[in-house]
Amino acid sequence: MSAQGDCEFLVQRAREWLITARSLYPADFNIQYEMYTIERNAERTATAGRLLYDMFVNFPDQPVVWREISIIISALRNDSQDKQTQFLRSLFETLPGRVQCEMLLKVTEQCFNTLERSEMLLLLLRRFPETVVQHGVGLGEALLEAETIEEQESPVNCFRKLFVCDVLPLIINNHDVRLPANLLYKYLNKAAEFYINYVTRSTQTENQHQGAQDTSDLMSPSKRSSQKYIIEGLTEKSSQIVDPWERLFKILNVVGMRCEWQMDKGRRSYGDILHRMKDLCRYMNNFDSEAHAKYKNQVVYSTMLVFFKNAFQYVNSIQPSLFQGPNAPSQVPLVLLEDVSNVYGDVEIDRNKHIHKKRKLAEGREKTMSPDDEDCSAKGRNRHIVVNKAELANSIEVLESFKLARESWELLYSLEFLDKEFTRICLAWKTDTWLWLRIFLTDMIIYQGQYKKAIASLHHLAALQGSISQPQITGQGTLEHQRALIQLATCHFALGEYRMTCEKVLDLMCYMVLPIQDGGKSQEEPSKVKPKFRKGSDLKLLPCTSKAIMPYCLHLMLACFKLRAFTDNRDDMALGHVIVLLQQEWPRGENLFLKAVNKICQQGNFQYENFFNYVTNIDMLEEFAYLRTQEGGKIHLELLPNQGMLIKHHTVTRGITKGVKEDFRLAMERQVSRCGENLMVVLHRFCINEKILLLQTLT
């Protein structure tokens, strides 16, 4: 105890000596600084604060003072909650407000790193709102200039983030800051570009910041959703933005009020905003040039943001793996396709048209117009999209987003001055490189029935995917490649280009993962109220799984071969392919099969040497066995490989003919034993093994 008492005595005497020395030599900096050091180390906040204030006033040129002030201000910017940092913050709070402001300004002036200087100045603006008028716009412009000088490739960078999220709200919400309209539009443009790019950043961009990781982990939605996106130059906390869309629309509203737009009071839905913009467009020609320019900007920016928000919502719902964060659940992606579920319907042949004439659709559908035939805007309305709620729980909201995005796009291109301004913005933002947007535009074009444009858009999509290193899914081609193939197939089919349809379908078959159970009844057709639209005008959102896509592919192939099989011209090969494909979802195709049997009966004979390789349906086997009997019409069937050559050979005898009959009987018996085989495996083998033959049939 004695030793401790001695120490306390010495410390106390030292303090007294310093106080005495300070009184004797008030102009001596070393004495003042020594006293400050003792009080700071003892964590006596009030005393240390007074001494720091005295040094700041009396010794402003001392580097040690500024080093100390810099340490304190760094603590203000630091998110850490350790004891030392909290003490330094408390020390700063003891200083008079005027001194705090002056300190922040001086430290900022001495900082030559643009990012650090901006963060210092931002600290000043937040603590002293009255300084926004003097320094706010200058800081904003400095950040935008730094972004240009540093040649940032992406708008999602540290300078833009500080400007859009931190500085801009301070500027535009301070009514003492006078801003011309053109500057407000410039800032709104910068904010929109940043937030949209931030929200829609792809997993590829994210992975570049995360460093090399295992590919299988990157493809896992659960792993991806737990990763944090960090903007280079900022901390993890500073890089996270809560409710970016909400922030963007708040900026839109504030800019709108400052620019005297026709604003509505209260919160309005995206549908309400779009409806208001449509109304405003009707009266645009009635305004003078100044008002016209003002409301043009209102329509362009309001409609554009509604478009991007809803297009993102749609793509994020059908292909969440494109985006990072908690919005990427382990959900199967969906793909928009023409509905061909009525493929088992009867065939109506136009006798005046050549069977292969383009845009003559299968299954008696009405002619699908190409963009060369009619105005797409009239055709692209009121098409019904079928979606199974089990595959997309929020299907109503997703389809509403798709509708709002389409209508916004149409409005932006409905008037020349809107088109011109929106195109200018898109060029500046390089939206043609946005993979997610190209996915939406492709689906929109398919919806509009502009299939030639859709094919071009899909090729553009493939080029975009090629420019981004896509991780491979083990055992499959990339998901994007499969999506493109099936959508190309559906577009070629709608154009009546059946050989190209089959080519894409058969390419896609290589990626199917087997076995797939054939459920008999269609798995892809949810119960729905049939809309009163023209027959065959429906679309459907199908899951990108082998279970859903393979049956759809087989439907497309059946639709392609149907017209050729049931023409006046005989084509046993096409008819045979149809019979093989009709096994899927049996007995849905029973009526079409009976039509095929009737055609065979009219012909009196039928040759299809692949019959026993791929027909395993017991009802079909029984029907063909019956056709050979007296009661069945004693139809001459050549269903065995090389059977035709045997019969046509000049040495044909009754014995050989009898042998052929015996071979047929044995083949039928063997075939009956195969009826338990997985039909989808059989049909998959049919598509893979007979690819050349299938394509030749459609040539």
Swiss-Prot record:
Modification type Phosphoserine: residues: S220, S370
GO annotation, biological process: RNA polymerase II transcription initiation surveillance; snRNA processing
Q: Which UniProt keywords apply?
A: Isopeptide bond, Nucleus, Phosphoprotein, Ubl conjugation
Q: Domain of life, per the record?
A: Eukaryota
**Cellular component terms (Gene Ontology):** INTAC complex; integrator complex; nucleus
Which Pfam families does the protein's record reference?
Answer: INT10 (PF21045)
- So which residues are the signal peptide here? none
Q: Where in the cell is it found?
A: Nucleus
Q: Where is this cross-link: Glycyl lysine isopeptide (Lys-Gly) (interchain with G-Cter in SUMO2)?
A: K453
UniProt-listed PANTHER family: INTEGRATOR COMPLEX SUBUNIT 10 (PTHR16055:SF2)
Q: Give the family per the record.
A: Belongs to the Integrator subunit 10 family.
Q: How does it assemble?
A: Component of the Integrator complex, composed of core subunits INTS1, INTS2, INTS3, INTS4, INTS5, INTS6, INTS7, INTS8, INTS9/RC74, INTS10, INTS11/CPSF3L, INTS12, INTS13, INTS14 and INTS15. The core complex associates with protein phosphatase 2A subunits PPP2CA and PPP2R1A, to form the Integrator-PP2A (INTAC) complex. INTS10 is part of the tail subcomplex, composed of INTS10, INTS13, INTS14 and INTS15.
Function, as annotated: Component of the integrator complex, a multiprotein complex that terminates RNA polymerase II (Pol II) transcription in the promoter-proximal region of genes.
Supply the name of the protein.
Integrator complex subunit 10
